[in-house]
Each structure stands twice: as structure tokens, then as C-alpha cells.
Amino acid sequence: MASSSKALIESIGSLDKDSYVSLLSKLIGESKFVQNNPPELIPQEDLIVKHVLDSLRPYSTETGGGPLVINHVAYHSGRGNLIVEYPGSVPGKILSFVGMHMDVVTANPDDWEFDPFSLSIDGDKLRGRGTTDCLGHVALVTELMKKLGQAKPALKSTVVAVFIASEENSSIPGVGVDMLVKDKLLDKLKSGPLYWIDTADKQPCVGTGGMIPWKLQFTGKLFHSGLAHKAINAMELAMEGLKEIQARFYRDFPPHPQEEVYGFATPSTMKPTQWCYPAGGINQIPGECTVSGDVRLTPFYDVKEVITKLQEYVDDINGNIERLETRGPVSKYVLPDENLRGRLTLSFDEASAGVACNLDSPGFHVLCKATEEVVGHVKPYSITGTLPLIRDLQDEGFDVQTSGYGLMATYHAKNEYCLLTDMCQGFDVFIRIISQLEQV
């Protein structure tokens, strides 16, 4: 390690555990009010902003106590974003930590072993809703910017932190990072790596999946189950129709060679997750049912192409429904005497594309080196979970890399927690990223 890099790391030091836990306790204490599930639960992210500002204002240009430049930007009342900048000396040389969102998913206290809306400590475990996703990261990056404001290291790079509103639910548009990008408030971040801090397990996450939510309605003919030859069984139509659609999907979108390069845990998948049918007696063959599910698509396939293909499958099945496999000697999907044919109807909700991070980016190599130095090993991974906001950033020209220091096992889960030692390592990774980019 170069002496200047080592000196920078030593000047900033490690995470102040007491300060971190104190701040996180305040944030988790607000988590009940930043649950994001409209229309019932609309988060008030400014409750989180207040605590972050209380930590950083003493080291800001606003108070004259330090170099931090703070910009609180709100597009909806009570739902602010926060941009915090530590200025460097070289124009255009910049790195950023983005994605630390100030809303959380819902939690039912009756289902938890401890109060989700107050921080509790069990050894190394810091427990509560948002500790892993993502208030733990809000507190961590706040402590990073606070340390920079206190130590005032002479950096060539400008370091920017962007705390965002409205990540967990997009049903209310125009609140968070999408608006910051639209208003060009983040444009200068395109000059350097943008680290999206909202994943888990201390390793670079280099790929995420796209998502295509779909719904298939199956229409047959309801009839008495003792006269099965007079019915078109919508459930059987659903089972066989969906089986055929899945077979065609996996034929046309097989595992992609790049998935191994990126370490994806799974290839693209198309599967049902919900089944709905009208209530009726057990002696009634149903005339309709609905199956819903999703496609999880690795970023090496095009979302629009998949949507087109799925519709083609359905159109072909409808046009040749006599060829679809049946179940038993009287099972059928056509009643010629009644001029009735079974029918599939496909619809989609809003789709999003996946992300493949740039593995040739200096920002990626710096993240890997810092992770190896601190954690002891580096193993980038990819999942077909979705982070649509970072795909939008990538499409806008940002060099997005992702990492996080919570636990994947507790992400969106009951009894959520993170580990203080993991967050300490995350802080050390951040400092090494900054120090290494000083040498680039």
C-alpha cells in the first residue's frame, strides 16, 4: 500500500461504533413511519433526513463548521432526498455512494420475536426493521461523511453521498432518485464510479435480473363434474397451457454464457406464483381461472423481446388449442357442437430490465481490491432479484457498481438484523475505495 494511501486511511480511521449505533437507534426508532406501502403507508423520509442532518450539519458550510456541502431536495412534502458533498481539489474527479434509501418495507410486530420499530442489540446483532435494508447503510454512509468532515483530508476526489426517498415502492412517482436524475442534480457523478449501497453480504453484486409480471386468464366452460364431457375444464387448460408456455420459454431463453461470467445463481426463469379461481362446489368443473407469476430475466436478454415471445406463444396456443395435451379420455378444450373453444388471455404489469455492471471499470476493480483487503476474499455475485433504479442510472450513463453490508438472509424478512462487525468492514471498504481512487 502506498504511503500516501496508508496515511489517508489512518487519518480517517475506523467506524466510530458508539456513534454509529446511536445514530442507527434513532433511525430505527422512525422506521414505523417510513414503511412504504401506499396508500395505507406513505413514508415520511424527512424524519430520517432530520437525524442525518443533525449528524452532519456541524461539519458543513451551512454552519461554518466544516467543508460538507448539503442539499436537501424534496419533491413531495415530508419526503426529501439528501445530497452531501465533500469537495476535492481536482475538477471532475469524483466518486459517489448512492442508493441508501430512507424508506423500509412493512413489518407486523405480531410476527416478530422483538420490536421491529426500535433498535435492540444482541451481541453483534443490531436488530430492527431497516438494519439490513437500508437504514443501516444510511447510518453507515452518514458516519463516513461525518468522518470526512471531521478529519478534512486533502483529497483530489470529490466524495458525494446521495440518500434517497421512495425505493421500496414506486406506486407514487416523482419522489426519489428518478427526479434527481431528471433535474440533472446528479449529472456530475457520471465522471466517476457510482457505488449503489443497497445489497448485502459484503461482496460486489455485479448483476441483477429484470422482472416481467404476467397474468394468464384461462376461459373454459363450467359444468357438473359428473358430466365432464360437457365441460371445458379451465384448471386443466391452465395446467397444460402454462406447461407449454414454460417449455417454449426455456427453449427460447436458455442459460446464457455470460451468466457464468457474472456468477448468476440462476438463469432466467418463468414461473407461476399465484392461482385464483371462482368459488364453487367440489362437484363443479370451473369455467375460468387465473394464474399469475413473473419472468426473472438475466440482463443478457431483452425484456421487450420476451414480452413479444410470450404473446406469440399464447396466440399460437389459442389458434391450435386442439393440439394442446389433455388429461383423460373426455378432457377437451373445444366443444364443436356448442361452437366453444377454450381461451388464454395474457396481460402484463410494468416490467423492468436487469443490470450487468461494467467489469472493466476502474471503479469495479477498486471495489474488488478494497473488499479483498478488508474482508479477506472477494467473490462477486449476481442474482435475479431486481434493482430497477440502478438500470435507469446505467442507461443514463452512470458507471454503477453495487455492494452492501447487511445480510441477504434477513433482507425484507421477519426479525431483520445486521452485524456491527460487517458494518465496520463496510466502512473500511469505503475508506479504501476513496484512498485507491486517489491514486488513479
Curated annotation (Swiss-Prot):
GO terms for biological process: L-arginine biosynthetic process. One of its GO terms (molecular function) is metal ion binding. Zn(2+) 1 binds at H101, D133. The active site is at D103, E167 (proton acceptor). Its EC number is 3.5.1.16. The keyword Endoplasmic reticulum does not apply. Pfam families: M20_dimer, Peptidase_M20. Its cofactor is Zn(2+); Co(2+). CDD domains: M20_ArgE-related (cd08012). Keywords: Amino-acid biosynthesis, Arginine biosynthesis, Cobalt, Hydrolase, Metal-binding, Zinc. Pathway: Amino-acid biosynthesis; L-arginine biosynthesis; L-ornithine from N(2)-acetyl-L-ornithine (linear): step 1/1. Zn(2+) 2 binds at D133, E168, H412. Binds 2 Zn(2+) or Co(2+) ions per subunit. It is an enzyme of class 3 (hydrolase). It comes from the Eukaryota. Belongs to the peptidase M20A family. ArgE subfamily. Homodimer. This is Acetylornithine deacetylase. It comes from Arabidopsis thaliana (Mouse-ear cress). The lineage of its organism: Eukaryota, Viridiplantae, Streptophyta, Embryophyta, Tracheophyta.
